[in-house]
Amino acid sequence: MKKIPPITSDRLPEKLKAIRERLNLSQSEILDRIGFGEFLFRSNISQYERGVRVPAPAVILAYARLARVDVAKLIDDKLNIS
């Protein structure tokens, strides 16, 4: 049986950074606001925003909830967050 491919979004890094900047938060502050401060480092946020690392689905969902946007707007490259 084949595995379902992971979610990939070329625009996810820019959308995550846009959310953080729209909320006027530093990378350390957003880490605490999304509730993963004890599990991740500021460098993880930097890697997500640069597209070096893909965040776990729970992190993507936390960003969506914080920004009050549908999670589909984060993972679908055809949709904008604003």
What is the meaning of each model-derived region?
Residues 1-23, 32, 72:
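A short, Lys/Arg-rich alpha-helix, primarily the initiator
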Residues 24, 52, 56-73:
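DNA major-groove recognition helix of helix-turn-helix/homeodomain DNA-binding modules
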Residues 24-47:
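Short alpha-helical DNA-recognition segment
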Residues 43, 47, 58, 76:
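Base-recognition residues in the alpha-helical recognition helix of bacterial helix-turn-helix
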Residues 79-82:
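Charged, helix-prone or intrinsically disordered regulatory segments positioned adjacent to compact structured domains
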